Regions:
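Transmembrane helices of ABC transporter permease
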Residues: 1-10, 112-166, 237-250, 267
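Alpha-helical segments in transporter systems
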Residues: 1-20, 24, 38, 42, ...
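Transmembrane helix-loop-helix hairpins at lipid-water interfaces of multipass membrane proteins
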Residues: 2-55, 59, 132-137, 247-252
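Hydrophobic alpha-helical segments in the permease module
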Residues: 42-53, 146-153, 219-233, 252-274
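Short intracellular "coupling" helices and adjacent cytoplasmic loop segments at the cytosolic face
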Residues: 65, 73-97, 101-105, 176-200, ...
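An intracellular "coupling" helix at the cytosolic face of ABC transporter transmembrane type-1 domains
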Residues: 84-85, 101-110, 114, 118, ...
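Cytosolic ends of transmembrane helices, especially the final helix of ABC transmembrane type-1 domains
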Residues: 193, 217, 265-292
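ABC-type nucleotide-binding domain
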Residues: 308-568
Length: 568
């Protein structure tokens, strides 16, 4: 920035020297007065002005772009630290629009308009000083135009600011709609909803068009008004200056120099006016960015997590709701002993997935606490705590990239040997080896190039690579065939050994072998015990097992009555 200001000063100085040379030439004009040195000085001043202007413009633009890059980086890092609750209430498209469109408006301001503003201010300030030095009376006449310009520009600026805010909001809505439709394009096509989505898109685009037209009207008025004011000012100055010359109060060369300085002041003033017009537009974008940056980030915590294998995971009278007046978990109170498997079953909407979210610290309990080894998990270092958790979800999300990228996502220093061992344990070796590029095969957006069972096996392999202390499974084998399930279940049995494991289960085979079963109903635990104990003591569990849990045809009917499963 300092170098840019130096270049700007040199450019301004070079531009302001020319009218002085012109004054001397006009006042004492003769062929003898035109010396080669004078011509060389004038040419040198023009060259210095051109080169200095280019260097100053580049340096100022570079500095401005660095500022925008810093804002984008800060915004991106802030997104990564925002709690999950923020993403529950805001669309991904809206947040993406803040990072791309809003910062793009800032880039236009600081990268395109700011350089002209800085050089314009320097030229205008120094030029006005020379104008007062040449003739202070005509300078006062010139300054009389400022209130007239402000009377027009201030209301227009307010209109543009309000319009810019509406444009940013509408652009964010369009980005959100685009992200929603494109990410679920298969659902759109399968539902025959193209016409509906076309209409939604047309309405949003039409709204942007109307706002852009309003902004264009304001912008189209600015330049003509400024041009009219400056032309009137120039006519007045020339007329009044002619009277001053005829009266002898000002020389002809002084009038020429005054007009040249006036032009050098008028042109920067136009740039400054355009800059402040763009500032009004950027205010809307800036307000949105500041609003995002003001959102509180996740509490990272500082307490180190106790060594692996020591802790008991405890839900201590936990109450939680996604909305203030609607509790999802109601006084949840249970413990998971080290090395044991606990299965959570119950009707849909009872809060099973929410339990997982609280363990991961995606949300904080409204009251009560989730404890590990006697400590509130909210006090643990967040990165350390989550590194101790392995999660195999039911939908098994994947990132666009290769199979290797997804297996090692968030895990540093994974060797090929460790990777293939995990792949083998998850029964994924055969299908990965059959792919043309093996683990380097691209899985596509959200893993669309793989089947559900393949995605699930990759999620299991990723959990194996994490070597977690706490393992959370959301019906981890639901998408596998019988043969694959047996192989993967064996790998999971190995993985679960010595670890605290929590399973959301819909299959009878998954829950029968659990050390403890929790029946979660409407946010409360209404039954706990082994499969056999709950069959005898919990009527709703028995009904649920008969009607909702799916099991293989090889399982005998007596497995429901005595708590055993054939083949286990």
């Amino acid at each position: 920035m300092g170098l840019a200001l130096v270049f700007s000063l040199l450019t301004t100085a070079a531009g302001l020297v020319v009218p002085l040379f012109t004054k001397s030439l006009v006042d004492g004009f003769s062929l003898q007065s035109i010396q080669p040195s004078t011509v060389a000085l004038i040419v040198g001043a023009f060259l210095l002005q051109a080169v200095g202007g280019a260097l100053a413009g580049y340096a100022l633009s570079y500095s401005g772009l660095k500022v925008v890059a810093s804002v984008r980086s800060r915004l991106w890092n802030h997104y990564l630290r925002l709690p999950v609750r923020v993403f529950d209430t805001r669309s991904a498209g809206d947040l993406a629009s803040r990072l791309t469109n809003d910062t793009g408006v800032l880039q236009s301001l600081v990268g395109d308009q700011f350089p002209g503003f800085v050089t314009g201010v320097l030229s205008a300030v120094v030029g006005v000083g020379f104008l007062f030095w040449l003739d202070w009376q005509m300078s006062l006449v010139m300054l009389a135009a400022i209130p007239l310009v402000m009377a027009v520009m201030v209301p227009l600026g307010r209109i543009r600011w309000k319009t810019a805010q509406e444009i940013q909001g509408e652009t964010a809505r369009l980005s959100g709609l685009l992200g929603q439709v494109l990410s679920e394009v298969r659902l759109v096509k399968a539902s025959g909803a193209e016409v509906r989505e076309r209409e939604r898109g047309r309405e949003t685009v039409s709204g942007l068009f109307r706002l852009g037209r309003r902004e264009g009207k304001v912008q189209s008025v600015v330049a003509p008004i400024m041009g009219l004011v400056m032309m009137l000012l120039l006519v007045v100055i020339v007329g009044y200056g002619g009277l001053r010359v005829s009266s002898g109060a000002l020389t002809a060369g002084g009038l020429v120099a005054f007009i040249l300085y006036l032009i050098q002041v008028v042109m920067p003033v136009t740039q400054i006016a355009q800059f402040f017009s763009q500032v009004q537009k950027a205010r809307g974008a800036t307000d949105s960015i500041v609003e995002i940056l003001s959102l509180p980030v996740e509490d990272l915590g500082l307490l180190p997590v106790p060594p692996e294998g020591r802790g008991t995971l405890v839900f201590d009278r936990v109450w939680f709701g996604y909305e203030p007046d609607r509790a999802v978990l109601k006084g949840l109170d249970f413990s998971l002993e080290p090395g044991t498997v606990t299965a959570i079953v119950g009707p849909s909407g009872g809060g099973k997935t929410t339990v997982f979210s609280l363990v991961e610290r995606f949300y904080r309990p409204d009251s009560g606490a989730v404890r590990w080894d006697g400590f509130d998990t909210a006090d643990f270092d967040l990165t350390d705590w989550r590194s101790r958790i392995g999660y195999v979800p039911q939908d098994c999300p994947l990132m666009a990239g290769s199979i290797r990228d997804n297996l090692t996502y968030g895990i540093e220093g994974v060797t090929d040997q460790a990777l293939w061992e995990a792949v083998g344990a998850a029964n994924a070796t055969e299908f990965i080896s059959a792919l043309p590029e093996g683990v380097e095969t691209q899985v596509g957006e959200r893993g669309v190039k793989l089947s559900g069972g393949q995605r699930q096996r990759l999620a299991i392999a990723r959990a194996l690579l994490r070597n977690p202390t706490i393992l959370m499974l959301d019906e981890a084998t639901a998408s596998l065939d019988a043969g694959s399930e047996r192989a993967v279940q064996g790998a999971l049995d190995t993985l679960m050994r010595g670890r605290t494991t929590l399973v959301i289960a819909h299959r009878l085979s998954t829950v029968v072998g659990a050390d403890k079963i929790l029946f979660l109903e409407d946010g409360r635990i209404t039954g706990r015990g082994t499969h056999g104990e709950l069959l005898r003591s919990h009527e709703l569990y028995r009904t649920f097992a008969e009607q909702q849990l799916r099991w293989r045809g090889t399982m005998e009917e007596e497995s429901i009555s005595d708590g055993t499963v054939a083949g286990r």
